[in-house]
Amino acid sequence: MPDKFKRVHVVVMDSVGIGEAPDAAKFGDFDVDTFGHIAKHVGGLKMPEMGKLGLSNIREIDGIKKAEKPLAYYTKMQEASNGKDTMTGHWEIMGLYIDTPFRVFPDGFPDDLINQIEEKTGRKVIGNKPASGTEIMAELGEEHVKTGALIVYTSADSVLQIAAHEDVVPLEELYEICEFCRKITLDDPYMLGRIIARPFVGEPGAFVRTPNRHDYALKPFKPTVMDALKDGGKDVIAIGKISDIFDGEGVTESIRTKSNMDGMDQFIAVLDKDFNGMSFLNLVDFDALFGHRRDPQGYADALVDFDGRLVEVMEKLTDDDLLIITADHGNDPTYSGTDHTREFVPLLVYSPRFKNGGSELELRKTFADLGATVADNFEVKMPEYGTSFLKDLK
């Protein structure tokens, strides 16, 4: 393909897996299938835009017709890295291979870590267990407001979260506490992927989170394709939690979002900008609101809503644009527990330039093939891992 694309748009539907990976059992996952099981649960998904692109051509999804002439190139990608969390998935998409998984704490954090937090802050720690943020806020929020104790909790991910009422622990103090936690959990025995500040406001029984969440991630251990793009003078516009996932590395502009639909609004606004490089959008609600909470109906509704916004996206794309839709792991809301699931992820690659539509690409054996393709397009340093499929897009 002679001309390169001026803009590449990578959209990550957080946790929207498309069927059990070959090594799923190693991760404790059996018969998991995020997309497939959601579709079955609701008696078929209505996602005509994704259908036209070729979603059911990857493998049939109840309710979504297989496209006779798919508009996009399509396949699925298999994760190579040793993990099934957000950071591992995104870092691999941008060209890294993660051998040592981030640590998880399904029984809460060790006393040693909790003691360090209490000594440093002069505040007691309450909670210290895996929990949904909204539930633990409802359960312990009143005690926190009365005592000033910090609500510390985790999830199925490698994460330490601290929830605090903005009138009890001022934002600046909460951020300082999280920065301290970040410093002491960079290496073994903790090796945590993220520390998250989770401020909230309101009265007992009606606490609500504020948009002042802040993530303190580990920096990627090697440069990613994003760094290569930035170093090559290209734009890297991070939308949603992308900047947090990469701790700002390789990002030239960061746009925060409040929800999937706000994320789509921001993305559509970015499409109106004149830039040369990559936009990178994460839609986290699929995972945070519906996957972990095991809510297949809510998840289905969110997928349908996303599909509805693709009409606006497609209208704004020109022959200079390449749109890549994928995911970072699975999170089957019909499965037991609350953890992510080890799955293949969909890959749909579209440009109005493809006048004859798309066709099937080879199965990708690492998410890094996506990053390699972006690097290849912009003629910047190729990642150590990944094989570009740019030449297959005709």
Curated annotation (Swiss-Prot):
Protein origin, superkingdom = Bacteria
Question: Catalyses which reaction?
Answer: 2-deoxy-alpha-D-ribose 1-phosphate = 2-deoxy-D-ribose 5-phosphate; alpha-D-ribose 1-phosphate = D-ribose 5-phosphate
UniProt: Mn(2+) 1 binding residues: 14, 328-329
Q: Which UniProt keywords apply?
A: Cytoplasm, Isomerase, Manganese, Metal-binding
Q: Name one Pfam family in it.
A: Metalloenzyme
Q: What is its EC number?
A: 5.4.2.7
Q: Which cofactor does it need?
A: Mn(2+)
The UniProt entry's GO CC annotations, sorted and at most eight, read: cytosol
- GO molecular function annotation: magnesium ion binding; manganese ion binding; phosphopentomutase activity
Which BP terms does GO give this entry?
A: 2-deoxyribose 1-phosphate catabolic process; 5-phosphoribose 1-diphosphate biosynthetic process; metabolic compound salvage; nucleotide metabolic process
Q: Describe how the cofactor binds.
A: Binds 2 manganese ions.
| Keyword presence, Manganese | yes
Which pathway does this chain act in?
Carbohydrate degradation; 2-deoxy-D-ribose 1-phosphate degradation; D-glyceraldehyde 3-phosphate and acetaldehyde from 2-deoxy-alpha-D-ribose 1-phosphate: step 1/2
- The primary location reported for this protein is cytoplasm
Compartment annotation? Cytoplasm
Q: Which residues bind Mn(2+) 2?
A: 287, 292, 340
Biological role stated in the UniProt entry:
Isomerase that catalyzes the conversion of deoxy-ribose 1-phosphate (dRib-1-P) and ribose 1-phosphate (Rib-1-P) to deoxy-ribose 5-phosphate (dRib-5-P) and ribose 5-phosphate (Rib-5-P), respectively.
Family membership: Belongs to the phosphopentomutase family.
Instruction: Kindly provide the name given to this protein in its UniProt entry.
Output: Phosphopentomutase
Organism from which the protein derives: Listeria monocytogenes serotype 4b (strain CLIP80459)
